[in-house]
Curated annotation (Swiss-Prot):
It catalyses: 2 reduced [2Fe-2S]-[putidaredoxin] + (1R,4R)-camphor + O2 + 2 H(+) = (1R,4R,5R)-5-hydroxycamphor + 2 oxidized [2Fe-2S]-[putidaredoxin] + H2O. Its main location: cytoplasm. GO terms for biological process: (+)-camphor catabolic process. This is Camphor 5-monooxygenase. One of its GO terms (molecular function) is heme binding. Heme binds at C358. It comes from Pseudomonas putida. SUPFAM superfamilies: Cytochrome P450 (SSF48264). It is found in: Cytoplasm. Its EC number is 1.14.15.1. It holds the Pfam family p450. Pathway: Terpene metabolism; (R)-camphor degradation. It comes from the Bacteria.
């Protein structure tokens, strides 16, 4: 395959001797070409017919990229060869990453995962059902008479973030500071390194954790800080690293997914009408939107030399496993760029795969379904503001920078 240079040669790492030149495809996960067409469209170039299932990019220090769903799933499942010890790219970010349990492999990971499940599992989500519903309705109703909003700022951020802050027992006035730090970890703007953002997050968490070890409540941080792993109390360091992960997950992923989904619905009145006329399809629509607008791309590190699908990988190589590419793989989903709410089999790895399947998926799905139902009930007809240029940002968690929406208040419905 002809080498495609997407990033300037000045930023390209030397090609390791074990990497064949025909597998080189210089894709920059933080600045892909054609990003203006949409972040998923920009990543879909990795699945064009002339691109191998496994490629090497010299961008961001140099790493492998699995481009097909089968390889992505196999690597997620095979933690003996593909370790979570260094899950972020570039390497310096991955080496600084020490959140628990996502930086661990089985069996060590399992006890911590069981503790995390106590704070974000289905029973917790069920208890939050009324609060989720109330907050969604309140936010949408406050926007409805205005006829316009920046959906990202006015709904996609405050809705899931306020739910998480409630779950964690943290004050809402801390949201701007925490959101800035999590953004620097997943879509950095250059103002902080990953390590600096992580340490700032830990500086915030340490006194809170110590306070709740002394006076525990029923919130997520108290449960983690006073939890048991492997038959012993969790240490302060372990609690800090677990709570750090909860904050990063709670303040970033659903925020961005909601904006991607609403951008699509704003441009597609026929899909909106389908859900208005057939609200029972909303759960299926949620799953199809999760497939089409998946947004996470994390990685693994090779624990030993290993031949994978005919390609020789070396110990210490990093491999990017873009979760979005499973759902966009035409080998798994026919016409993958097309959104079909009646799709019979929806295949994706939006919440990961294998031992690190996202524990927050139940809360995420609930928040998405409630948003679709309550928004379309109140504001059925809306569009992108005239002249607005929607910008996406690519990274470990991709996002929509701003989403200006408009509608005629006369067509809305107070509920």
């Amino acid at each position: 395959m002809t080498t495609e240079t997407i990033q300037s040669n000045a930023n390209l790492a030397p090609l390791p001797p074990h990497v064949p030149e025909h597998l080189v495809f210089d894709f920059d996960m933080y600045n892909p070409s054609n990003l203006s067409a949409g972040v998923q469209e920009a990543w879909a170039v990795l699945q064009e017919s002339n691109v191998p299932d496994l490629v090497w990019t010299r961008c961001n220090g140099g790493h492998w990229i699995a481009t097909r769903g089968q390889l992505i799933r196999e690597a997620y499942e095979d933690y003996r060869h593909f370790s979570s010890e260094c899950p972020f790219i570039p390497r310096e970010a991955g080496e600084a990453y020490d959140f628990i349990p996502t930086s661990m492999d089985p069996p060590e990971q399992r006890q911590f995962r069981a503790l995390a499940n106590q704070v974000v599992g289905m029973p917790v989500v069920d208890k939050l059902e009324n609060r989720i519903q109330e907050l969604a309705c309140s936010l949408i109703e406050s926007l409805r008479p205005q006829g316009q909003c920046n959906f990202t700022e006015d709904y996609a951020e405050p809705f899931p973030i306020r739910i998480f802050m409630l779950l964690a027992g943290l004050p809402e006035e801390d949201i701007p500071h925490l959101k800035y730090l999590t953004d620097q970890m997943t879509r950095p703007d250059g103002s902080m390194t990953f390590a600096e953002a992580k340490e700032a997050l830990y500086d915030y968490l340490i006194p809170i954790i110590e306070q709740r070890r002394q006076k525990p409540g029923t919130d997520a941080i108290s449960i983690v800080a006073n939890g048991q792993v492997n038959g012993r109390p969790i240490t302060s360091d372990e609690a800090k690293r677990m709570c750090g992960l909860l904050l990063v997950g709670g303040l970033d992923t659903v925020v961005n997914f909601l904006s991607f989904s609403m951008e699509f619905l704003a441009k597609s009145p026929e899909h909106r009408q389908e859900l208005i006329e057939r609200p029972e399809r909303i759960p299926a629509a949620c799953e199809e939107l999760l497939r089409r607008f998946s947004l996470v791309a994390d990685g693994r590190i090779l624990t030993s030399d290993y031949e994978f699908h005919g390609v020789q990988l070396k110990k210490g190589d990093q491999i990017l496993l873009p979760q979005m590419l499973s759902g966009l793989d035409e080998r798994e989903n026919a016409c993958p760029m097309h959104v079909d709410f009646s799709r019979q089999k929806v295949s994706h790895t939006t919440f990961g795969h294998g031992s690190h399947l996202c524990l927050g998926q139940h809360l995420a799905r609930r928040e998405i379904i409630v948003t679709l139902k309550e928004w379309l009930t109140r504001i059925p007809d809306f569009s992108i503001a005239p002249g607005a240029q929607i910008q996406h940002k690519s990274g470990i968690v991709s996002g929509v920078q701003a989403l200006p929406l408009v509608w005629d208040p006369a067509t809305t419905k107070a509920v």
